[in-house]
């Protein structure tokens, strides 16, 4: 089976594929200081628990220090297996129609490939993670750029940190947009404000594009808020891993 690894700022998601079929998946906390040996032993433990036999590995990361450890881990623990890390020089088939292609994160590239392959374009991917990333894909499958916004958990943390009379509260949907106490008022403003922000950014993007085939939600925090977002058309929690599989097939 192919092992795909997506290392984000907060979480690392792994999945195994048998051909096009996703068979197993795991989500663990990202530690940018993890050594190659720690990663190797952890991944081997996860795979052994489900009796998974790996025949190849594909990886991408937005965390440079973690990516170096992954590269060393692959060479040390899987030296005989074909493996691929999404980085400049890897064939993705995605044209980057932006000012500086070197600035584009690997996750955004593989999201573009998977979304265009599955849904066509124009399309928009909203990745709900530590940050909220909006990725715009043309009708020809080009990556056109997008937008960044704070993630919902960052927004909750920032308000508590900067407002003396307010404390940190759980990032969750309140019972009403009209809060009856301090906690509910915080949750109402942040939660519904965040959902409204997502919808407005997507609406403005659609206005510029003219029309879209799909608006895809992904990322670990997507389930928290997508029911309140009126512009989301599909939820694909594994879109990055699916894209990794597609890039691997193009290169190995």
From Swiss-Prot:
Cellular compartments annotated: Cytoplasm
Its EC number(s): 2.7.1.33
Residues the entry annotates as binding ATP: 6-13, 130
GO process annotations (BP): coenzyme A biosynthetic process
Residues holding substrate: 105-108, 182
Cofactor binding note of this UniProt entry: A monovalent cation. Ammonium or potassium.
Superkingdom of origin organism: Bacteria
MF GO annotations: ATP binding; metal ion binding; pantothenate kinase activity
Name of the protein in question: Type III pantothenate kinase
């Amino acid at each position: 089976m192919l092992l795909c690894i997506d290392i984000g700022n907060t979480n690392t998601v792994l999945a195994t594929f048998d051909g096009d079929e996703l068979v197993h998946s795991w989500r663990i906390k990202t530690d940018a200081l993890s050594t190659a040996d720690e990663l190797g032993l952890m991944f081997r433990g996860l795979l052994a628990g489900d009796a998974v036999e790996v025949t190849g590995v594909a990886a991408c990361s937005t965390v440079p220090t973690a990516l170096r450890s992954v590269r060393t881990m692959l060479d040390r623990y899987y030296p005989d297996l074909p493996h691929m890390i999404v980085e400049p020089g890897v064939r993705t088939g995605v044209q980057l129609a932006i000012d500086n292609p070197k600035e584009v994160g690997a996750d955004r590239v593989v999201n573009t490939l998977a979304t265009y392959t599955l849904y066509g374009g124009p399309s928009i991917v909203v990745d709900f993670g530590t940050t909220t990333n909006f990725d715009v894909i043309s009708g020809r499958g080009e990556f056109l750029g997008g937008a960044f916004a704070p993630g919902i958990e960052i927004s909750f943390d920032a308000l508590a940190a900067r407002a003396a009379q307010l404390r940190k509260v759980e990032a969750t949907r309140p019972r009403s947009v009209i809060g009856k106490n301090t906690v509910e008022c915080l949750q109402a403003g942040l939660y519904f404000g965040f959902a409204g922000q997502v919808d407005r950014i997507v609406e403005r993007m659609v206005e510029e594009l003219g029309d879209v085939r799909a608006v895809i939600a992904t990322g670990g925090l997507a389930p928290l808020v997508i029911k309140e977002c009126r512009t989301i058309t599909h939820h694909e929690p594994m879109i990055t891993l699916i894209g990794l599989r597609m890039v691997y097939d193009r290169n190995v």
